[in-house]
Curated annotation (Swiss-Prot):
Induction: By stress conditions e.g. heat shock. Residues 578-592 have a biased composition (Basic and acidic residues). InterPro entries: ATPase_NBD, Chaperone_DnaK, Heat_shock_70_CS, HSP70_C_sf, HSP70_peptide-bd_sf, Hsp_70_fam. Keywords: ATP-binding, Chaperone, Nucleotide-binding, Phosphoprotein, Stress response. NCBIfam families: PRK00290.1 (NF001413), prok_dnaK (TIGR02350). PANTHER family: HEAT SHOCK PROTEIN 70KDA. The keyword Lyase does not apply. Residues 600-617, 638-649 have a biased composition (Low complexity). GO terms for molecular function: ATP binding; ATP-dependent protein folding chaperone; unfolded protein binding. Acts as a chaperone. Signal peptide: none annotated. This is Chaperone protein DnaK. It comes from Chlamydia caviae (strain ATCC VR-813 / DSM 19441 / 03DC25 / GPIC) (Chlamydophila caviae). Pfam families: HSP70. The gene is dnaK. The lineage of its organism: Bacteria, Pseudomonadati, Chlamydiota, Chlamydiia, Chlamydiales.
C-alpha cells in the first residue's frame, strides 16, 4: 500500500464553546468545509455511549437520554482550576471534579477525562472533516482562542491540538481572526472594534488595519460570559414557572434539565427573529396524579429583562478596551459582530449605544473566525502574501516580590512576540535560593492574581541581602505563550521554564493522551469495520435469497442448495457474533457461489439463443446489468471494470491509509 502524501495546507479551526468550524485556503480564498453530516459548523459535544465515543451532531442527538455522559461547553473549563469554575459547574449535568493537582476533570463511567482530551476529540473531528475534503492527511493547524484567554488556557488549547495529532502552528485570538477575515481585501486605514459574544466567552478587541498590517491596539473581555449564561436565565425562569404551576422542582432532574437546556437554546435563537415564542415540553416529568407537561410563552421583552444583567456586563470591557487603545468611540470606523449571541437584537442595541453607530453585519458570525484562522494558516504557509499580524497579550505578566506584591514585567496589551528583562535581588543575607512565582493579572497584590507557574533558582553564592544580581527574562512567543528564565550574574547559573501553568498538562500526560486518542481511533476503526462487515453480510443474504427466488427455475437445483447452505452459514456467524474475518470469509464464499448463478444464466441464455422456442416457453431474458446486481462481491476481482466497485475499493483503501498513518 503506497504511503499518502500529507497535505501542505495549514487548516484554520475555530474551536468554539458551542460549535466548531474548519476552513482552508483554496485558490487564494478561505473556504469553510462542510462536515460529513452536511453542516458548516459542528457542535462541540462529545458523548460516551457504551463502547462508542460520539462527536458533534450524533452526540447532540442523544444528549437528552444520556445527559451525564454527554460533555458540552467543556471549553469553559480548559486550562482552569476546579476552584475557578464553581459557577460553570452548576450549569452542566455531567460530573466535574478536581484532579490530583486541582485541575478540572470530568468523570464518566468511573474514568477521568481532562478538558484537553475532550477538546482533542472535537479537533480530531475537524481534522477528519478537512482530510475528507482535501483527500490527504492534515497535520498542521491554526487554532483560535478567546482573546481574553490567559496563558494556561492558551497552552492547554495547544496541548489539545497535540493530542489530536496536530502541529499547532499558531494560536490566535478569535477577534483577531475575525478582523483578518474582514480586512484582508479592504483598502485604506481603519480602526475597528470586534465585539465577540460566543457560547462561553466575551471578547472585545480594538484593531488598526491598513496595507496588510493588522495591529491589535487593545483587548478586554470576560471568560465567564457567553450564550450558555443566556440559556441559563431562561432555564431558571422555566423551572420557577413550572414550580408555580405544578409544585414540582425540575432542577434536580438531569434528563428534564437537558430538555430545558435544548428548549432554552431554541427559544433564545427564535427570539432573535420573532417577538414571542412558545415553549412546549410534553411529559417533562410525572407525579402520583400522572404525567406533567410544560407549556410556556416567552416574549422577547421578557427575555431581555431576564438577561439585562448579562447585557450590562458587556459594557465595561468595551470602555476599558477603548481607554487602553487611547481612543474614543467616535474614532472607531466599524464594529464587527462575531459569535452566535451577537444576533440577539438587544446585544446589537448595546453595541450601538457603546460605539454610537450601527454594527457591521456583513460577516457570518459563526464562520468568520475559522475563515480568519485559515487566512493566518495561509500567511504561515506562504500562500497569503503581504499580511502582518501584530497581536497583544490580554493580561499583564509579572512575578511576586517582597511583601507579596505583583511586579509586572510585561504590561497588558503589549504587542507580541516580545521579550522583557528586569534585575531582582535577594530579600535576606546569604539567601541560597529564590522561588520565582509567575503571575498573570491586573491586581497589585500577588494573591489576587492568577499564578501560572513557579520554579526555583538554587545555589546562589552567599552574599548580603540585595547584592546578588538575578536577571529575570520574560519571553512571549507569537502564540502568547510565556517562557521565563532567571539567571544569577555571579555564578552564571540559569533556570528556564516554559509556562505550562499550574493547571497545564505535563509532557508525559500529553503523550498518554495522544496514545489514548490513537487507541480509540483504532478501536473506532475496528468497530466500523465490524459494522460494515455485518451490514454487508446482511445485504448479501438479501441479494442471494432474491436471486434464488428470481432464477431458481433456470439454474441447477444443486446450485440452489449450495447457495442456501452458504446463506445459512452467513446467518450462523452473524448470530454467533463471530470475528470480522469469519464474517467476511462466509460472505465472500456466498459471493463466489452467487457468481455461479451468472455463469449458469449465461449458459441458459446461450441455449435459448439456439432455439427460438425457448423464449416462447417463458425463459427469462437476462441482461448483464441484472447479473452484476446479483453477483456483487465484497471485494471486486482484480481487473473488475465496474466503476462503482472500483471507486468503493479506492475509498476504503484511502480511509485505511489515513487512519493508520502515524502522526508526524
Amino acid at each position: 500500500m503506497s504511503e499518502q502524501k500529507k497535505s501542505s495546507k495549514i487548516i484554520g479551526i475555530d474551536l468554539g464553546t458551542t460549535n466548531s468550524c474548519v476552513s482552508v485556503m483554496e485558490g487564494g480564498q478561505a473556504k469553510v468545509i462542510t462536515s460529513s453530516e452536511g453542516t458548516r459548523t459542528t457542535p462541540s459535544i462529545v458523548a460516551f455511549k457504551g463502547n462508542e465515543t460520539l462527536v458533534g451532531i450524533p452526540a447532540k442527538r442523544q444528549a437528552v437520554t444520556n445527559p451525564e455522559k454527554t460533555l458540552a461547553s467543556t471549553k469553559r473549563f480548559i486550562g482552569r482550576k476546579h476552584s475557578e469554575v464553581e459557577s460553570e459547574i452548576k450549569t452542566v449535568p455531567y460530573k466535574v471534579a478536581s484532579g490530583s493537582n486541582g485541575d478540572v476533570v470530568f468523570l464518566v463511567d468511573g474514568k477521568q477525562y481532562t478538558p484537553e482530551e475532550i477538546g482533542a476529540q472535537v479537533l480530531i473531528k475537524m481534522k477528519e472533516t478537512a482530510e475528507a475534503y482535501l483527500g490527504e492527511p492534515v497535520t498542521e493547524a491554526v487554532i483560535t482562542v478567546p482573546a481574553y484567554f490567559n496563558d494556561s488556557q492558551r497552552a492547554s488549547t495547544k496541548d489539545a491540538g497535540r493530542i489530536a495529532g496536530l502541529d499547532v502552528k499558531r494560536i490566535i485570538p478569535e477577534p483577531t481572526a475575525a478582523a483578518l477575515a474582514y480586512g484582508i481585501d479592504k483598502a485604506g486605514d481603519k480602526k475597528i472594534a470586534v465585539f465577540d459574544l460566543g457560547g462561553g466567552t466575551f471578547d472585545i478587541s480594538i484593531l488598526e488595519i491598513g496595507d496588510g498590517v493588522f495591529e491589535v491596539l487593545s483587548t478586554n473581555g470576560d471568560t465567564h460570559l457567553g450564550g450558555d449564561d443566556f440559556d441559563e436565565v431562561i432555564i431558571k425562569w422555566m423551572i420557577e414557572e413550572f414550580k408555580k404551576q405544578e409544585g414540582i422542582d425540575l432542577s434536580k432532574d438531569n434528563m428534564a434539565l437537558q430538555r430545558l437546556k435544548d428548549a432554552a437554546e431554541k427559544a433564545k435563537i427564535e427570539l432573535s427573529g420573532v417577538s414571542s415564542t412558545e415553549i412546549n415540553q410534553p411529559f417533562i416529568t410525572m407525579d402520583a396524579s400522572g404525567p406533567k407537561h410544560l407549556t410556556l410563552t416567552l416574549t422577547r421583552a421578557h427575555f431581555e429583562k431576564l438577561a439585562s444583567t448579562l447585557l450590562e456586563r458587556t459594557k465595561a470591557p468595551c470602555q476599558k478596551a477603548l481607554a487602553d487603545a487611547k481612543l474614543s468611540a467616535s474614532d472607531i470606523d466599524d464594529v464587527l459582530l462575531v459569535g452566535g449571541m451577537s444576533r440577539m437584537p438587544a446585544v446589537q442595541e448595546v453595541v450601538k449605544s457603546i460605539f454610537g453607530k450601527e454594527p457591521n453585519k456583513g460577516v457570518n458570525p459563526d464562520e468568520v473566525v475559522a475563515i480568519g484562522a485559515a487566512i493566518q494558516g495561509g500567511v504561515l504557509g506562504g500562500e497569503v502574501k503581504d499580511v502582518l499580524l501584530l497581536d497583544v497579550i490580554p493580561l499583564s505578566l509579572g512575578i511576586e516580590t517582597l511583601g507579596g506584591v505583583m511586579t509586572p514585567l510585561v504590561e497588558r496589551n503589549t504587542t507580541i512576540p516580545t521579550q522583557k528583562k528586569q534585575i531582582f535581588s535577594t530579600a535576606a543575607d546569604n539567601q541560597p535560593a529564590v522561588t520565582i512565582v509567575v503571575l498573570q493579572g491586573e491586581r497589585p497584590m500577588a494573591k489576587d492574581n492568577k499564578e501560572i507557574g513557579r520554579f526555583d533558582l538554587t545555589d546562589i553564592p552567599p552574599a548580603p541581602r540585595g547584592h546578588p544580581q538575578i536577571e529575570v527574562t520574560f519571553d512571549i512567543d507569537a502564540n502568547g505563550i510565556l517562557h521565563v528564565s532567571a539567571k544569577d550574574a555571579a555564578s552564571g547559573r540559569e533556570q528556564k521554564i516554559r509556562i505550562e501553568a499550574s493547571s497545564g498538562l505535563k509532557e508525559d500526560e500529553i503523550q498518554r493522551m495522544i496514545n489514548d486518542a490513537e487507541k480509540h481511533k483504532e478501536e473506532d476503526k475496528k468497530r466500523r469495520e465490524a459494522s460494515d462487515a455485518r451490514n454487508e453480510a446482511d445485504s448479501m443474504i438479501f441479494r442471494a435469497e432474491k436471486a434464488i427466488s428470481d432464477y431458481k427455475d433456470n439454474i441447477p437445483e444443486s446450485l440452489v442448495k449450495e447457495i442456501e447452505e452458504r446463506i445459512e452459514k452467513v446467518r450462523t456467524v452473524l448470530k454467533e457474533e463471530a470475528p470480522v474475518e469469519k464474517i467476511k470469509d462466509a460472505s465472500e464464499e456466498l459471493s463466489r457461489h452467487m457468481q455461479k448463478i451468472g455463469e449458469a444464466m449465461q449458459s441458459q441464455s446461450a441455449s435459448a439463443a439456439a432455439s427460438s422456442a425457448a423464449n416462447a416457453q417463458g425463459g427469462p431474458n437476462i441482461n448483464t446489468e441484472d447479473l452484476k446486481k446479483h453477483s456483487f462481491s465484497t471485494k471486486p476481482p482484480a481487473g473488475n471494470s465496474a466503476s462503482s466497485n472500483s471507486n468503493n475499493e479506492n475509498i476504503e483503501e484511502a480511509d485505511v491509509e489515513i487512519v493508520d498513518k502515524p502522526n508526524d
